[in-house]
Amino acid sequence: MSPEALSELISSIAHNLVAAGQAGALTDELIPPVDKLAVMRPKDRAHGDWASNIAMQLAKKAGMKPRDLAEPFAAALAEADGIAKVEVAGPGFINITLDSASAAAVVDTVLAAGAMTDTDKHLNKVNEYGRNAHLGGQTLNLEFVSANPTGPIHIGGTRWAAVGDAMARVLEANGAKVVREYYFNDHGEQINRFAKSLVAAWAEANNLGEAGYQTETPCDGYKGAYINEIAARVQAEAESDGVDLTALAHQDQGLNDDGEPLGEADTEVREEFRKRAVPMMFDEIQKSMKDFRVNFDVWFHENSLYADGKVDAAIEELKSRGDIFDKDGATWFESTKHGDDKDRVIIKSNGEFAYFAADIAYYWDKRHRAENPADVAIYMLGADHHGYIGRMMAMCAAFGDEPGKNMQILIGQLVNVMKDGKPVRMSKRAGNVVTIDDLVSVVGVDAARYSLARSDYNQNFDIDLALLASHTNDNPVYYVQYAHARSKNVDRNAAVAGISYEGADLALLDTEADGEVLAALAQFPSVLATAADDRQPHKVARYLEELAATYHKWYNVERVVPMALTDPETRGDDEARKALEIAKNPEPARAAARLKLNDAVQQVIANGLDLLGVTAPEKM
């Protein structure tokens, strides 16, 4: 019996007690929905397989003492099929012990779940176990990473890539249609600074400083070896196309008010670098994402909002709703009407659009585009965007939508890469960039994705490169993957020994260690549902670590494949030890049941790792 089935049984009993007049003043309307009646796993196995606090939840509404209300619940539960024992404990907890056959039914449930048919979307051989449709009918637009195209993806963006894709997979496993979207910021001042930085690098490489060209990176520009590399690529591409950058620079070069060179190439050459370098960065970012197993459905270019008139259209929409006004020569969004702490400029007094104007148009586009309009627009933003939440939610409300429902904003905290016990700086401007490709080259995709997805994005996170590269149980991804590989090895050994679980009697899974594994398997569906509802995919990783620990412990105390005298563990002259080891061998029926349990664990680990975008290895 699964935890969900127990919750449904408890809910049914509550309604029956109301009908029978055994629940005091309680009415059907006061009974919470089933998902609010979840059972818990007792810390002490002596207290049973599951525990419910429903009597304490409902006692006040019923006008009864918790223990007095718990008694009729316990009596009804004790009569249900699959339940071996029920006890009322403490202030009103109801402890439930399942019979072994009922507890073990989860094994059949896991292995009988249908295989996923969209195999091209999965890394592992996964099945439907754990999946549900409670988010069915919803289209969720999940925007993540969206780093500026002014350099390679740094470690902060890498965290969002791992978390965002894992979240998308978890949401899809709960029935939602998810549109993965990357917002490509190819409009605005940061692109201008990027182009200036490239021009300076090009001028320095071509010894144009003496001619009056600026070769120093602008103080607000971008530094790093990648700037020099891209500048050289732009120059080579331009020359191949017959474009003379030096001639363009000479054409641009002007004088300041004192008749001296400006020291900086201007519009023409800078535009040449911009139009060639931005697509180069776009291609590099796309490749990095693909190599990291993140496949976006939409690559949205900010420039298109202006080119297609979407910014003007969105502002007109807000104006028609009475939320736009003019002041001091500028155009403002009256966001204070919708809970923001101050009104926001959207068109400056010089006629230029403020950055927020694009945000307004982008949200409106997500909600009303022809293909896959979003029921919910989820933004995954860095810690430096915390101040944006108020204005974004106000804009959502101004469009007649519900903040927190139609728009959700998730803020991620910082990531530090540790070197010699100290954080490595990660600023693109400092030239000391830790990129997604750097991380993958050191620890691999599996370790990078798992480690970043297993940490709560609401908290700062330190990456220990040495730990992630290690093959020890201290490395979480290794620990979980090893559990899967170990289960595969059990299968291979069982095949050699001629053991099959065909017709296995799962009621023989009656030891304490068996029970712990069974309970862990039964919790996977609720973990998956909670991870989706809470937007916290790290809960899947933490569950996998608990399942792996439970499995490793079970493996060490409950033998699956009989050990023979020829096995390495029983070789040697110690006849007493060999006899003891052989005595531990399970009888064939129990071995078959344990083999089936082994394969159920294997399946759930494969399912869980797939949700994190991590492979489930056959061998390690």
From Swiss-Prot:
Protein's cellular compartments: Cytoplasm
Highest taxon listed in the record's lineage: Bacteria
SMART domains: Arg_tRNA_synt_N, DALR_1
GO molecular function: arginine-tRNA ligase activity; ATP binding
Record-level GO BP terms: arginyl-tRNA aminoacylation
InterPro entries: aa-tRNA-synth_I_CS, Arg-tRNA-ligase, Arg-tRNA-synth_N, Arg-tRNA-synth_N_sf, ArgRS_core, DALR_anticod-bd, Rossmann-like_a/b/a_fold, tRNAsynth_Ia_anticodon-bd
UniProt motif 'HIGH' region: location: 147-157
Catalytic activity: tRNA(Arg) + L-arginine + ATP = L-arginyl-tRNA(Arg) + AMP + diphosphate
Record EC number: 6.1.1.19
Keyword tRNA processing found: no
GO CC terms of this entry: cytoplasm
Pfam families: Arg_tRNA_synt_N, DALR_1, tRNA-synt_1d
Gene3D superfamilies: Arginyl tRNA synthetase N-terminal domain, HUPs, Isoleucyl-tRNA Synthetase, Domain 1
Swiss-Prot/TrEMBL keywords: Aminoacyl-tRNA synthetase, ATP-binding, Cytoplasm, Ligase, Nucleotide-binding, Protein biosynthesis
HAMAP family: Arg_tRNA_synth (MF_00123)
NCBIfam families documented for this protein: argS
Similarity comment text for this entry: Belongs to the class-I aminoacyl-tRNA synthetase family.
Assembly mode: Monomer.
This protein's name: Arginine--tRNA ligase
Organism (species): Bifidobacterium longum (strain DJO10A)
Lineage: Bacteria, Bacillati, Actinomycetota, Actinomycetes, Bifidobacteriales
Gene name of this polypeptide: argS
